[in-house]
Amino acid sequence: MSQTPGGAPMAPEAMGCHSTADMAAAASAAGNGELMERFKADYPVGPHDKPQSMCPAFGSLRTGLRMRRVGTIISGSACCTYGLSFVSHFYGARRSIGYVPFNSESLVTGKLFEDIREAVHEMADPQRYDAIVVTNLCVPTASGVPLRLLPSEINGVRIVGIDVPGFGVPTHAEAKDVLAGAMLKYARSEIEAGPVQAPVSGRSDRPTVALLGEMFPADPVMIGALLAPLGLAAGPVVPCRDWRELYAALDSGVAAAIHPFYTASVREFQAAGRAIVGSAPVGHDGTAAWLAAIGEAYGIAADKVAAAQNAFLPAIRGALAGAPIKGRITLSGYEGSELIVARLLIESGAEVPYVGTAAGRTPWSAADREWLEARGTVVKFRASLEDDLAAMQGFEPDLAVGTTPVVQKAKSLGIPSLYFTNLISARPLMGPAGAGSLAQVINAAIGNRERMSKMKAFFAGVGEGDTAGIWEGAPNLRPDFRAAHQKKLEKAARAAKSEEMI
C-alpha cells in the first residue's frame, strides 16, 4: 500500500482513480487476491491498466436497476456514487440507489462492513424485493471489504455482493457480466438445492436457447422466429429483467454468446452442463453458420437445419441487396457487438478495413474474427483510443463509427462520423430485420462529407492551438512573445551545439 511522507500507510481513498497498480496491490494484500486473479483471467487488460470509457460499475449498476424487485446498494467514494447515480438516472433509471458512506476510520476498523450489513438488513423487505445487489467500488475493494461474508439471504431476500473496481474490470460492458455471472451462480445453487419458481411468463413448450448480451428489443423476437423451424424457441436474455428468468436461462439447453465477452456467465452455463454457441445470426453468412451451430449443439438433423436456412437466407440476401452501403468505414466501440456489426456492414457492400473493440478476445468471437480477417479487415481486441484514432487517420474512411472521442476527432478532421452506442448498436441486427437496418443512417452520414468540409473551412483555426479554450474576448495571441521566445530557444540550441564541438 502507498505511504504518506511520514511513512504511514496511505488510505485507499487518497489514491484516486489513477492509482491503478497501487490499488490492485492493496486489494491483493487486503485479502482480495483470489478476486484479482479471477478478474485477470476473465477480463485480461490491454495496453492500458485502467478503463478509457465510463466507470465500469455503471454497467452492472444499470442492469441491476432495470431488474424488477431488485434493490441496489453501493459502497464507494461519495464522488463516484454521485456520478454513477447521476448518469444512471440520466439514462432512465427510475429507482433510488442505496449508499453506505465511509471514512478512513471505518475502513481501517472494519466498521464499513458492519454498516453495509446493517443497511442490507434494514433494506431486506420481501414485500418489495426478491434480491439486493451490493456493489463494492474501487476503494472498498482495495481495502478488502468482504462482501462474501454477508448473509446469502435475509428474510427471504437474496443478497448478491459483487466487486466492480476500475482496476480489475476494464469496461462497463464487462461489468454487466460480473453481475450476471454472480446472479447465475446464485440461481444455479438454488436450482441444485431443489424446485424453484417458474418465470412469470411461464415455461416454453419447446427447448430454448438463452441469449447472452443486451440487444435491441426486436432482436430476441427475430431470433425466436429463426429458431422456430428447428423446433426451438428463444430463451431469456441475460442480463435478465426478473430473477426467475435466471432459472429459465439455466434451463435452456444452449446458451448463445451473442456478445462474446460474458466470460463469468459462460462459466455458469458450462457448470450447468449447457453448450455455448458463439457469433450471432447477423447477415447471410452469419445466420447460416449460426443456425448450423445451434442445430449441431441440439443434435438436430441436417435436413431440418437446411430447411430453416432456406426459409430465411433468401430474404436476408434480398434485404442486403435492397439496402446497399457504399463507402469505407472504420468501426470501434465498447459494447462488444462491434464484430457482428462489421460483418453486417461488409455484407451490405461497405469496405471495413478496421474494427476495434474495447472488449477482450474470447473463444466465442473466433468465428467473427476469422470471417472479418478473411476479408482483409484488421480486428483489434482491447483496442485503445489511440488505436482507434490511428486507424481512422491512417485509413481515411468515408465514415468513422466509434466512441465519443473518436467521433469528436473525426469531426475536427472533416470526416463524417456516428456514435456507435446510440446510433448503431441501438438498432435491430439479427436476421432479415437487421439486414437492411443500417443502410439509411450510414448512407445519410456518408453523404455529409461536403457539409463537413464546409464546416471545417468555416471554423478553421478556431479553438485550436493558441486559440484553444474559452475566451471572454478575442484570443490574446501575442506573436511578439512567441517570436522572442523562439529566439531564446534557437540561441540555447546554438550554445548546446557549440559545447558538443568542444
UniProtKB/Swiss-Prot annotation:
It is found in: Cell membrane. GO terms for cellular component: plasma membrane. Disulfide bonds: none annotated. Its main location: membrane. It is a multi-pass membrane protein. The keyword Cytoplasm does not apply. InterPro entries: BchY, LIPOR_BchN/ChlN, Nase/OxRdtase_comp1, Protochlorophyllide_Rdtase. It comes from the Bacteria. It catalyses: 3-deacetyl-3-vinylbacteriochlorophyllide a + 2 oxidized [2Fe-2S]-[ferredoxin] + ADP + phosphate = chlorophyllide a + 2 reduced [2Fe-2S]-[ferredoxin] + ATP + H2O + H(+); bacteriochlorophyllide a + 2 oxidized [2Fe-2S]-[ferredoxin] + ADP + phosphate = 3-acetyl-3-devinylchlorophyllide a + 2 reduced [2Fe-2S]-[ferredoxin] + ATP + H2O + H(+); 3-deacetyl-3-(1-hydroxyethyl)bacteriochlorophyllide a + 2 oxidized [2Fe-2S]-[ferredoxin] + ADP + phosphate = 3-devinyl-3-(1-hydroxyethyl)chlorophyllide a + 2 reduced [2Fe-2S]-[ferredoxin] + ATP + H2O + H(+). The chain crosses the membrane at residues 70-87, 131-147, 221-238. Its EC number is 1.3.7.15. Pathway: Porphyrin-containing compound metabolism; bacteriochlorophyll biosynthesis (light-independent). The keyword Repressor does not apply. GO terms for molecular function: oxidoreductase activity, acting on iron-sulfur proteins as donors, NAD or NADP as acceptor. Keywords: Bacteriochlorophyll biosynthesis, Cell membrane, Chlorophyll biosynthesis, Membrane, Oxidoreductase, Photosynthesis, Transmembrane, Transmembrane helix. GO terms for biological process: light-independent bacteriochlorophyll biosynthetic process; photosynthesis. Pfam families: Oxidored_nitro. Chlorophyllide reductase is composed of three subunits; BchX, BchY and BchZ. Forms a heterodimer of one BchY and one BchZ subunit. Converts chlorophylls (Chl) into bacteriochlorophylls (BChl) by reducing ring B of the tetrapyrrole. Belongs to the BchN/ChlN family. NCBIfam families: BchY. This is Chlorophyllide reductase 52.5 kDa chain. The gene is bchY.
